[in-house]
Curated annotation (Swiss-Prot):
It is an enzyme of class 1 (oxidoreductase). This is Opine oxidase subunit B. Its EC number is 1.-.-.-. Oxidative cleavage of octopine into L-arginine and pyruvate. It comes from Rhizobium meliloti (Ensifer meliloti).
Length: 371
């Protein structure tokens, strides 16, 4: 058994972002991570730095996402300085393509609702008909009737981000332990005792950033983390010599040249295997948008489970019963990485989350049940 000041449970994008941010703030956390075969959203990530459409009926989430996207370039520079790794950030805006007038109208209504709910502070967006879209994006198929464009959106190499955060956090002083799945957390008068197979840690403070495991661990420190099943699937093509003309909600070209196709969700499957039916739907929609993709072979497909809360909005919490315990859960680990590292981590270091983050507390679910 050994003693530390701060332990982060979980070494995915959320945990690593916070660990790097803490190390930059002068605190050297211990990061306890699970096994390589664990269900890791961080390694199945699409890599979007995305604002468009987020935060419908949750203006605080819409503005939080936008704020993080805006400071992503600042984070990228600092992360490159600390790790020597370029995470491939590209922020040139993105499109949501519609294959029917009804689809375009539904997206437009959502975007207008977000603009209204945020009092006009959400990023500007353009509603484009087919001709306007064609003037901006060449090579579209005949089924595309229009699009929504938002200049705030971008993408990055999610695996490079994962590697950069791990490299940077350790260079700045964080300690990392893989194959250290935490099984129990016991609050004490001095902090917390974390136990797993073959190890015990006494920690004065603890941060739960364990993804899907948060739901199990949260009650041990007087918190809750209600999650729902959200399985996504991604197709990846061979490397293309021709650049995809733009970024969109369901398609992005990786910096290595392959094209990633995604945007599916299964809510009733616990299997990690991919579905041929979903692959067919993803491929069909992609070809309707960009018919030229028919010249490319799909090389691989994978699935992942999003860390999606019961209402889809991040949970940021601190324990009232056991001071020193914090919890963070979200399915936007890439988009929100900048906020987690540059804003949230310093608050953890100070010992208290600021009041403006209280809207993300899981206590909101108690209030909803009481209504």
């Amino acid at each position: 058994m050994y003693e530390v000041d701060m332990t982060i449970v979980g070494g995915g994008l959320v945990g690593a972002s916070i660990a790097w941010g803490l190390a930059r703030s002068g605190i050297n956390p211990l990061v306890l991570d699970g096994d390589d075969l664990d269900l890791r959203a961080s390694r199945a990530n699409f890599g979007l730095v995305w604002v468009q459409g987020k935060g419908l009926h949750a203006p605080h989430y819409a503005l939080w996402s936008d704020a993080s996207a805006k400071v992503w370039p600042t984070m990228t520079k600092a992360l490159s300085d600390d790790s020597g790794i370029d995470v491939g950030l590209r922020q040139a805006g993105a499109y949501t393509f519609a294959l029917s007038e009804e689809e375009l109208e539904a997206v437009r209504e959502d975007m207008e609702s977000i603009a209204l709910e945020t009092n006009g502070r959400a990023p500007h967006f353009d509603v484009l008909n087919r001709q306007q879209t064609l003037e901006r994006v060449p090579g579209l198929g005949p089924d595309v009737v229009g699009s929504i464009y938002c200049s705030a959106d971008g993408h990055a190499n999610a695996l490079a981000l994962f590697h950069a955060l791990h490299t940077a956090m350790q260079k700045k002083g964080a300690a990392y332990r893989s194959n250290h799945r935490v099984q129990t957390i016991e609050p004490t008068t001095e902090g917390f005792i974390l136990k797993g197979h073959g190890f015990s840690v006494i920690s004065r403070r603890v941060v739960l950033a364990a993804g899907l495991e948060n739901e199990r661990l949260a009650p041990m420190v007087g918190l809750s983390c209600p999650l729902k099943c959200s399985k996504g699937q991604i197709l990846v093509t061979e490397k293309s010599q021709t650049a995809l003309p733009c970024l969109s909600a369901g398609m992005r070209q990786a910096d290595e040249g392959g094209i990633m196709i995604g945007d599916s969700e299964e809510t009733d499957s616990a299997k990690i295997s991919s579905s041929s039916g979903i692959s067919a739907v993803l491929a069909s929609r992609a070809l309707k948008i960009f018919p030229a993709l028919s010249d490319l072979n799909v090389l691989r497909s994978w699935t992942g489970f999003r860390v999606k809360t019961a209402d889809g909005i991040p949970i940021y919490d601190q324990s009232e019963r056991y001071p020193g315990a914090f919890l963070f859960a979200c399915h936007s680990g890439v988009t929100l990485a900048a906020n987690h590292a540059l804003i949230v981590a310093p608050q953890i270091a100070s010992g208290k989350l600021e009041d403006d983050l209280s809207v993300f507390s899981a206590r909101r679910f108690d209030a909803q049940q009481a209504e």
